[in-house]
């Protein structure tokens, strides 16, 4: 069965694929789209494997996917300043219902709450059970929780029609705006944040953010959904249809979003003494108690960042530092008021001297971590200035601005894709490592400060990788200069089946909504409007 791997045939296959690669690179390019003048890679793969070329959405099992042709899914138009080329998948309707929700119900009629409950007891029984146990569906537990705008307590049940309407052909998907009718205090707090908060997690940090705008919708949909539900819907933290505050008080509610290589707050908390206490005490704790001093033995995400139930976690932060990628000394005199408030919070369990020492420890560790990053950045920028980066910006696909700007320069777009390996390593160092050094110190994760995820020693490894890559580039450049060879970056850095899908190719004059950046009701990301001058 392994005859296919015999050397003669393997040479034929290799030569055939090599021919395909040369053919593809020789394809004429027009407006960033490959114009196939010869056989495509899929055509050659079809000859090798004996499988016809076909669309990737027809249900066929394609061998290694090599004979499949990409088919764009259904999109909906995006929003924001780049709406002319930003696309979303239809599933965004569940996370940004105010702008995308469409009622798909086939049922007709206007129904009372008890009729909704009767039908959905059969159709969606878990939803009904949750509602009956919630403060919306049980008079016994709801009194005194919901307060109307007029200051009177909500005593009647909050039924299906109160949130979704009673006309089945006009059903609505609620947002925080509807919750505001009964929970004005919590809603006001939720809407009081600045840049980097839940308040603007989607409208600013997705619609203006390069890592979303600059990629095909299919691969960044998770980012859009996570950010959108944080901004637009209250059910991200206390899920429907129970909407239990006890659920939102547990760290696992925060873990859904605040985890992973680029912002690993969960791992930092979970590997700290605080996290160990949570694991030990969680089953015995009364999560129904409010977030007040003395109610909890374990410091949780909500206890520290949502003091007394404040729904603006950012209120207790010192300053937004772009997930820790921007340097700031949080212990500096200008931030004394914030520092004092944190020490006061820590006094629930610790002496003020201990708390102050641990926070100073964080300041020192963070400041040192940026010396490594600057050392790495100097190496990277030096290679760019000497023209030895491969590819140089003009040799790669354009960034989402439609530019060919070096990633670390003003107006540049730091990215993991369609860029040189040297720049990619640099972005990993500042985003995956340096940012998480701060999070490790801030959450008292002693191991991760030094050895673990996003640690000082991981920074060391990345710094060596960056210098090794830079040394190779300089050695190659020296050899090429000595033998008189003028290097040109390979075309695969600029074009490919995936690269040709990138939005940067689609940028054209007049495609930016310049008025968006005149809005004063939202903060704006740095560099969000880069290149507007040449695109309007």
Swiss-Prot record:
<dbReference type="GO" id="GO:0046872">
    <property type="term" value="F:metal ion binding"/>
</dbReference>
<feature type="binding site" description="covalent">
    <location>
        <position position="163"/>
    </location>
    <ligand>
        <name>heme c 2</name>
    </ligand>
</feature>
<comment type="function">
    <text>Catalyzes the oxidation of hydroxylamine to nitric oxide with cytochrome c acting as an electron acceptor. Does not oxidize hydroxylamine to nitrite. Also able to catalyze the four-electron oxidation of hydrazine to N(2) in vitro with reduced efficiency; however, this reaction is probably not physiological.</text>
</comment>
<comment type="subunit">
    <text>Homotrimer; subunits are linked by two covalent bonds between Tyr-451 of one subunit and heme P460 of an adjacent subunit.</text>
</comment>
<keyword id="KW-0408">Iron</keyword>
<feature type="binding site" description="covalent">
    <location>
        <position position="349"/>
    </location>
    <ligand>
        <name>heme c 8</name>
    </ligand>
</feature>
<feature type="binding site" description="axial binding residue">
    <location>
        <position position="183"/>
    </location>
    <ligand>
        <name>heme c 3</name>
    </ligand>
</feature>
<keyword id="KW-0732">Signal</keyword>
<dbReference type="GO" id="GO:0033740">
    <property type="term" value="F:hydroxylamine oxidoreductase activity"/>
</dbReference>
<feature type="binding site" description="covalent">
    <location>
        <position position="237"/>
    </location>
    <ligand>
        <name>heme c 5</name>
    </ligand>
</feature>
<dbReference type="GO" id="GO:0044222">
    <property type="term" value="C:anammoxosome"/>
</dbReference>
<feature type="binding site" description="covalent">
    <location>
        <position position="257"/>
    </location>
    <ligand>
        <name>heme c 6</name>
    </ligand>
</feature>
<feature type="binding site" description="axial binding residue">
    <location>
        <position position="227"/>
    </location>
    <ligand>
        <name>heme c 4</name>
    </ligand>
</feature>
<feature type="binding site" description="covalent">
    <location>
        <position position="234"/>
    </location>
    <ligand>
        <name>heme c 5</name>
    </ligand>
</feature>
<feature type="binding site" description="covalent">
    <location>
        <position position="226"/>
    </location>
    <ligand>
        <name>heme c 4</name>
    </ligand>
</feature>
<feature type="binding site" description="axial binding residue">
    <location>
        <position position="305"/>
    </location>
    <ligand>
        <name>heme c 7</name>
    </ligand>
</feature>
<feature type="binding site" description="axial binding residue">
    <location>
        <position position="198"/>
    </location>
    <ligand>
        <name>heme c 6</name>
    </ligand>
</feature>
<dbReference type="InterPro" id="IPR036280">
    <property type="entry name" value="Multihaem_cyt_sf"/>
</dbReference>
<feature type="binding site" description="covalent">
    <location>
        <position position="179"/>
    </location>
    <ligand>
        <name>heme c 3</name>
    </ligand>
</feature>
<dbReference type="Pfam" id="PF22142">
    <property type="entry name" value="Hao_C"/>
</dbReference>
<feature type="binding site" description="axial binding residue">
    <location>
        <position position="241"/>
    </location>
    <ligand>
        <name>heme c 2</name>
    </ligand>
</feature>
<feature type="binding site" description="axial binding residue">
    <location>
        <position position="443"/>
    </location>
    <ligand>
        <name>heme c 7</name>
    </ligand>
</feature>
<feature type="binding site" description="covalent">
    <location>
        <position position="304"/>
    </location>
    <ligand>
        <name>heme c 7</name>
    </ligand>
</feature>
<feature type="binding site" description="axial binding residue">
    <location>
        <position position="164"/>
    </location>
    <ligand>
        <name>heme c 2</name>
    </ligand>
</feature>
<feature type="binding site" description="axial binding residue">
    <location>
        <position position="350"/>
    </location>
    <ligand>
        <name>heme c 8</name>
    </ligand>
</feature>
<dbReference type="GO" id="GO:0042802">
    <property type="term" value="F:identical protein binding"/>
</dbReference>
<dbReference type="GO" id="GO:0006809">
    <property type="term" value="P:nitric oxide biosynthetic process"/>
</dbReference>
<feature type="binding site" description="axial binding residue">
    <location>
        <position position="258"/>
    </location>
    <ligand>
        <name>heme c 6</name>
    </ligand>
</feature>
<feature type="binding site" description="covalent">
    <location>
        <position position="160"/>
    </location>
    <ligand>
        <name>heme c 2</name>
    </ligand>
</feature>
<feature type="binding site" description="covalent">
    <location>
        <position position="182"/>
    </location>
    <ligand>
        <name>heme c 3</name>
    </ligand>
</feature>
<feature type="binding site" description="covalent">
    <location>
        <position position="119"/>
    </location>
    <ligand>
        <name>heme c 1</name>
    </ligand>
</feature>
<keyword id="KW-0479">Metal-binding</keyword>
<keyword id="KW-0349">Heme</keyword>
<feature type="binding site" description="axial binding residue">
    <location>
        <position position="274"/>
    </location>
    <ligand>
        <name>heme c 8</name>
    </ligand>
</feature>
<feature type="binding site" description="axial binding residue">
    <location>
        <position position="168"/>
    </location>
    <ligand>
        <name>heme c 1</name>
    </ligand>
</feature>
<feature type="binding site" description="covalent">
    <location>
        <position position="301"/>
    </location>
    <ligand>
        <name>heme c 7</name>
    </ligand>
</feature>
<dbReference type="GO" id="GO:0070207">
    <property type="term" value="P:protein homotrimerization"/>
</dbReference>
<feature type="binding site" description="covalent">
    <location>
        <position position="223"/>
    </location>
    <ligand>
        <name>heme c 4</name>
    </ligand>
</feature>
<dbReference type="GO" id="GO:0020037">
    <property type="term" value="F:heme binding"/>
</dbReference>
<dbReference type="InterPro" id="IPR054394">
    <property type="entry name" value="Hao_C"/>
</dbReference>
<feature type="signal peptide">
    <location>
        <begin position="1"/>
        <end position="26"/>
    </location>
</feature>
<dbReference type="GO" id="GO:0019331">
    <property type="term" value="P:anaerobic respiration, using ammonium as electron donor"/>
</dbReference>
């Amino acid at each position: 069965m392994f005859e296919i791997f015999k050397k003669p045939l393997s040479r034929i296959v290799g030569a055939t694929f090599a021919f395909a690669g040369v053919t593809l690179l020789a394809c004429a390019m027009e407006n960033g789209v490959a114009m196939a003048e010869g056989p495509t890679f899929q055509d050659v793969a079809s000859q090798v494997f004996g499988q016809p070329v076909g669309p990737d959405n027809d249900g066929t099992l394609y061998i290694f996917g090599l004979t499949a042709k990409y088919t764009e899914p259904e999109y909906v138009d995006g929003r924001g300043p780049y709406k002319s080329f930003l696309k979303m998948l239809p599933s965004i309707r569940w996370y940004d219902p105010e702008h995308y929700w469409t009622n798909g119900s086939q049922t007709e009629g206007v129904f009372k709450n008890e009729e909704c409950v009767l039908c959905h007891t059969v159709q969606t029984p878990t939803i009904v059970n949750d509602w009956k146990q919630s403060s919306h569906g049980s008079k016994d537990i709801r009194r005194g929780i919901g307060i109307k705008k007029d200051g009177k307590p909500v005593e009647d049940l909050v039924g299906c029609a109160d949130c979704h309407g009673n006309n089945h052909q006009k059903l609505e998907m609620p947002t925080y705006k509807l919750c505001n009718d009964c929970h004005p205090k919590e809603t006001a707090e939720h809407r009081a944040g600045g840049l980097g908060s839940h308040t603007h997690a989607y409208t600013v940090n997705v619609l203006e953010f390069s890592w979303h705008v600059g990629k095909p919708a299919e691969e960044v949909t998770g980012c859009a959904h996570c950010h959108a539900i944080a901004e637009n819907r209250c059910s991200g933290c206390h899920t429907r249809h129970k909407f239990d505050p006890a659920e939102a008080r547990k760290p696992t509610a925060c873990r859904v979003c605040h985890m992973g290589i680029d912002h690993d707050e969960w791992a930092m908390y979970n590997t700290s003494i605080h996290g160990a206490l949570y694991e030990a005490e969680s089953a015995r704790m009364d999560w129904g108690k409010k977030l007040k001093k003395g109610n909890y033995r374990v410091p949780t995400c909500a206890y520290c960042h949502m003091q007394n139930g404040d729904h603006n976690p950012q209120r207790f932060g010192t300053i937004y530092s772009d997930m820790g990628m921007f340097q700031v000394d949080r212990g500096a005199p200008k931030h004394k008021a914030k520092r004092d408030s944190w020490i006061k919070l820590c006094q629930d369990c610790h002496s003020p001297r201990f708390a102050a020492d641990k926070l100073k420890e964080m300041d020192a560790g963070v400041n040192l971590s940026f010396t490594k990053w600057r050392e790495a950045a100097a190496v990277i920028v030096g290679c760019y200035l000497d023209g030895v980066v491969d590819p140089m910006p003009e040799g790669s696909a354009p960034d989402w601005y439609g530019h060919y700007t070096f990633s670390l320069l003003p107006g540049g777009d730091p990215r993991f894709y369609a860029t040189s390996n040297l720049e990619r390593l640099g972005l990993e160092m500042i985003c995956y490592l340096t940012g998480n050094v701060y999070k490790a110190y801030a959450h008292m994760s002693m191991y991760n400060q030094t050895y673990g995820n996003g640690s000082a020693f991981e920074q060391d490894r990345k710094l060596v990788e960056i210098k090794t890559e830079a040394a190779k580039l300089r050695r190659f450049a020296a050899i090429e200069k000595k033998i008189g060879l003028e290097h040109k970056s390979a075309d695969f850095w600029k074009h490919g089946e995936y690269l040709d899908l990138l939005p940067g190719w689609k940028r054209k004059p007049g495609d930016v909504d310049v008025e968006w950046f005149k809005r004063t009701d939202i903060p704006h990301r740095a560099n969000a409007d880069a290149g507007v001058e040449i695109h309007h």
